[in-house]
Amino acid sequence: MAAKGWELKVTEFTDYVQPNEVVESGDMDANYFQHITYMESYNEEKGTHLVDAGDIHYEPLGVYPGKQTDLSAITDGAEIAVPNDTTNEARALLLLQEQGLITLNDGAGITATVNDIKENPHKIKFVELAAEQIPRSLPDFDFAVINGNYALEAGLNASTDALATETSDSDAVKKYVNVIAVKEGNENNEGIKALVEVLKSEEIKKFINDTYQGSVVPYEG
């Protein structure tokens, strides 16, 4: 940012409300912590006017091996652990559908639950657990779908350990990409455009890839 003539001041928050309040009030110019769906829901609930100034990264869910190691050879009746919260369960099911393991009802999309499974040829048993609990329970299941942040905390490498991960062009990623949020009308400010340009630069992409090893991925959409 300095090379572009801007001084960047960073303030850390420990909750998901204050960062939006200070941007809405104009006390701060932007925040970077939330995915676009959360921002839109926050606007709807709070009557705020936050907009997406730039799509920066996503944290892909991955399918990790437990008792079994080959998705293409999954046995009938296999148990797969999936997150039990609405958002991540839907993402998990969409990912498993992309791998050809199940078929969901038409239109299920990012609100899908296990009740939306239309075809389950391998008679997979889905066990719903709190997302943070799944990594330590991995040995108990044939496979598990794990969030990027919890995989990272558990020492799992999404690039080398996951059998499949969400990709940039998936519907789920488009809905859960982390963004630079600003107050409506400020998205074309020169400072904001400079910030987005820096965060989408090849240098920052390399930093993200080298640091997080696939658990956080630069968004290319």
Set out the residue ranges of the language-model regions.
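Short, polar/charged alpha-helical segment
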Residues: M1-K9
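Short helix-initiation/N-cap motifs at beta->coil->alpha
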Residues: V10-E21, G109-R136
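Pocket-flanking alpha-helical
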Residues: Y16-G47, E153-G155
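Alpha-to-beta junction loops
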Residues: E24-Q34, A78, L101, H122-K125, ...
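Ligand-binding "clamshell"
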Residues: S41-A53, G66-T69, D140, V145, ...
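A conserved helix-loop-strand patch within extracytoplasmic ligand-binding domains
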Residues: A53-I102, K205
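A bilobed periplasmic-binding-protein/Venus flytrap-type ligand-binding module shared by bacterial periplasmic
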Residues: P60-L71, Y176-N189
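Periplasmic-binding protein-like
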Residues: A90-Q97, L199-Y219
